[in-house]
Amino acid sequence: MVSLARTEGFNQKNLKDTVYHALRSIDFKPPHNIKSILIKPNLCYYWDFSTGETTDPRVVASIIDYIHEMGCGEAEIKIVESDASAMRAKHAFKMLGYDALANEKSVELVNLSDDETCEKDITVRKHRFTFTLPRSIFNCDLLINVPKLKVGPYAGGQCLHMTCALKNLFGCIPQPKKVEFHAYLNETIVAVNKLINSDLTVVDGIIALGRHPVRLGVIIAGKDNLAVDSIAARVMGYDPKRIKHLRLATEEKVGSVEHLRVVGENLRDICNLFPRRNRYRFKVSWTMQLSLLRLYARFSGDSLPSVLEKYED
């Protein structure tokens, strides 16, 4: 079951009521005896939530309040993120409002790139992966995934349809230069999700990102990342069966979309509000920009960031 909730207002009370409604609709009740909770937002860069790129801290604050009101006030709560090629979590926490949130709610901020690690092996489509992953992800009692509702980037020579629940857990990989996984991006996303199982997913679609940012006012909640992503894909105008990493996740039995039920808002009404992106135009635009950057580097003697040098046209 996946819930779809929508707010007409955008202040803290409106957002909190919408998050609560989404969680109650799926009857989410954390066990009272849990001691440690990890919350993983999407803080992929230093753009704040108004751009549609990163998780709104007010959504995370509402989740924390809900957990406390459900009788888990004694649980240790940590908000976690890892470094990326062009982002350091400690700076993102400060710039995106999470330092203030941590102080207000008395929770801890953790950079997964500084965490103790463990090695995990997994196979997807006969491709064997060995990941070095944060130990705390496996030691917590409750893992809450709080991704963004947004279209995906152009990575590793391919245009990723969407970035949501499954892709956000890819961000748990602690090494900053994740570009090395882009050659097998779909397989890597699924592999990570075979190893890391979140207990709850709350998608921040308050300001969503399609062709441009839009004040969609939507919260999607569920306990199955594949099911949540399937509904998120439909909101964005995609057929989930045509999205490679969702199709692969289904094959690898990472979650289930059989007998999927949506409660709350009318899915079609939300779909009509989302600014769909033309993937062909996006790919052409990105390829042209990259070609111009390479031309500039050739004549100026300047260098491209390593993350761009590894892309292929």
Residue spans for each PLM region:
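N-terminal and secondary-structure boundary signal
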Residues: M1-D313
